[in-house]
């Protein structure tokens, strides 16, 4: 999957860019 390496806070996968997923840490990865 393609995930830009940008630190983004999230609550759900839809908060993240491209194919990033929302990790348990509360950040996209």
UniProtKB/Swiss-Prot annotation:
SUPFAM superfamilies: Plant inhibitors of proteinases and amylases (SSF57027)
Entry keywords, A to Z: Disulfide bond, Knottin, Protease inhibitor, Secreted, Serine protease inhibitor
Major localization class: secreted
Site for Reactive bond, residues: 5-6
UniProt key word Signal: no
Location in or out of the cell: Secreted
Classification via Gene3D superfamilies: 4.10.75.20
UniProt keyword ATP-binding, yes or no: no
A Pfam family reported for this protein in Swiss-Prot or TrEMBL: Squash
Alphabetized GO MF terms: serine-type endopeptidase inhibitor activity
Disulfide bond annotation, renumbered to this chain: 3-20, 10-22, 16-28
Gene Ontology terms: cellular component: extracellular region
Domain notes: The presence of a 'disulfide through disulfide knot' structurally defines this protein as a knottin.
Function: Strongly inhibits trypsin, weakly inhibits chymotrypsin.
Family: Belongs to the protease inhibitor I7 (squash-type serine protease inhibitor) family.
Designated name of the protein: Trypsin inhibitor 3
